[in-house]
Amino acid sequence: MGNGIGKLSKCLTGGAGRNKKPELSILEPDPLDEGLGHSFCYVRPDPTRVSSSKVHSEEETTTFRTISGASVSANTATPLSTSLYDPYGHIDRAAAFESTTSFSSIPLQPIPRSSGPIVPGSGPLERGFLSGPIERGFMSGPLDGSSGPIDGKTGSDQFQRSFSHGLANLRVGSRKGSLVRVLRRAISKTITRGQNSIVAPIKPVKEPDWVFGSDKTRIHQIENNLTVNSLNFSSEGSLLDDDVSLESQNLQWAQGKAGEDRVHVVVSEEHGWLFVGIYDGFNGPDAPDYLLSHLYPAVHRELKGLLWDDPKTDAKSSDEADVENRDSSSEKKSKNWEESQRRWRCEWDRDLDRLLKDRSNGLDLDPDPNSSDVLKALSQALRKTEEAYLENADMMLDENPELALMGSCVLVMLMKGEDVYLMNVGDSRAVLGQKAESDYWIGKIKQDLERINEETMNDFDGCGDGEGASLVPTLSAFQLTVDHSTNVEEEVNRIRKEHPDDASAVSNERVKGSLKVTRAFGAGFLKQPKWNNALLEMFQIDYKGTSPYINCLPSLYHHRLGSKDQFLILSSDGLYQYFTNEEAVSEVELFITLQPEGDPAQHLVQELLFRAAKKAGMDFHELLEIPQGERRRYHDDVSIVVISLEGRMWKSCV
């Protein structure tokens, strides 16, 4: 599985990197295993390297400097429940990644055992994986050339495009012959496998170019017989339209999967914004796949007139007003659905208005009066996306009742200039690393340092006076999101108050003994009795009344970046199985201090695996040799995005 070689690094680095000749570093001639996870990066382009039509002044660029991302899978690959015939079925990778060429990625590659012993916790520089894409860019220097226009195709065509893009500007020298042979063999293997996108596509699925003959005929037969295409359930009724076309917006994007986690990153250097979505699915892949395909387009539409203006006329405004009624076939459905949705929307809007009012009445008044409108737009986008998902699931309930079990946590971050907008449902987190106030440092941080693993502390003690002082963490952790789980007393009390006649509303620290999170996208069996009744008896809960046990009402937060803000960690909850907020921030700070050219997200994944292995009494490689699915006993799927701010401020165009 995987590409014959790693994706050639295109992350641009500092001046030292530019002075080096481009080199190709091939670490292993064998195909890389993409099933474990991926590390990826995006570095803001140098304006001098961008065409004059796209050059923006420093005041017009995005606030962040770099994006480092990494994901590791613990669960096995699971096909969409709606797939009757799936030409992707032979692809059993639990992890995958694809992007435009402005991103660089490489599969996570454990250091070979033969390279020497790996002692968990031997110090901050201890390594379990080979270099990530950012570090490789520093070692080999940036490749010439800028990314071309976004191609509508994904999968194998894209990976081949990445190879050719890098090779066009590569100068190999005396090693040319042997390297060309390796590359030719790698590309040949990639083409032979006929790999295609195994992540839910941004646009509705097109017929794979590599499906021929009887398979193609069979696909057409199934498509004609299905009410909802089994190959593109996640794209059915897509919110995409001409306004949201990625090709027409000059956007750079990346999307990946790791087990049941999904990650989506969209960058607009032209308009100065960044979108990151992390979707932590459970009970199946359909819900996070649907979010991956639909939530960003919905957010983009809701933000029209707030963060962006349509240069075209509003001739299509009447069509946009009818987006919720886009599926004409649903008109024959019972009016009970429409009535329940109207009641739900009213409750959602009422709760949202109360939430925003409570925020405005708080001690820290929001300096941006527009922020409440932006946050409300994010919430409305999520509501419409879930309504569409549940409506599609309701249409397929007889054939695929398991859709009622599937759900996902949601973490969305939108950055526009100095403004950061957060929306979350579930227990994924956004944690900000800030320069701490002196009083705060003397008190809380010193206490938190005691919880840092003793191996790292021993490494501090082994440093000289000068070095040791520089390694002491100086940043505080500020969580921008709110956890929605049974670990939060307020959430438990809310559910019990809403279900006074049900003593088992929360039992065994789970909602109805089933779900740890108290809010989630999907999971219809905890929201309406009919979805619970559609399940096999062994999966049903004792549903009392008609009120939902969980909801999808998000927590919302606006933060104005300042000079003290250094980096932002966005992650699914798997990270915090082994890290506190303070430990995660301290780990990233320590890493970028010692290895400023490194990949902090990959480092966090690596340290998490070290801790999981140590807790289980095994070494790093032994843990990774445990098959996916069984390895879920030791750690969860984990997706991490670290956005470097470095305390610098750039203003985006408005």
UniProtKB/Swiss-Prot annotation:
GO terms for cellular component: nucleus. This is Probable protein phosphatase 2C 23. It comes from Arabidopsis thaliana (Mouse-ear cress). InterPro entries: PP2C (IPR015655), PPM-type-like_dom_sf (IPR036457), PPM-type_phosphatase-like_dom (IPR001932). Keywords: Developmental protein, Hydrolase, Magnesium, Manganese, Metal-binding, Nucleus, Phosphoprotein, Protein phosphatase. PROSITE patterns: PPM_2. Its main location: nucleus. Residues 243-645 form the PPM-type phosphatase domain. One of its GO terms (molecular function) is metal ion binding.
